[in-house]
């Protein structure tokens, strides 16, 4: 029969897992921030061009295409919920960092505290999935 896991191994394993989520959420917050802001700026510029089509003769000839691009871009932004995904990733990145800090300040042999932090982490993972995945 194998020996029960040493508290330090459980502690280190939990720290590695939380650290992995910190890196993951940070990476995806950057990705979704870029998608969100690039799409928003593009939509604003294209919509402004469509609105100014009467004053800008060169744009008048492609106004219908620009209007279509604005409609498609807006639909994609709404469907993908880029803002919600971006906010979800950066919000949970902060939460994972706070949990990691709590873990760092906890003695590895304090099994009860480590187990409580693990339960908190598991709940956080479920909440994280809900926050960043579109409905």
Stretches found by the model and what they are:
Residues 1-62, 66, 72-135:
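Conserved non-transmembrane functional hotspots
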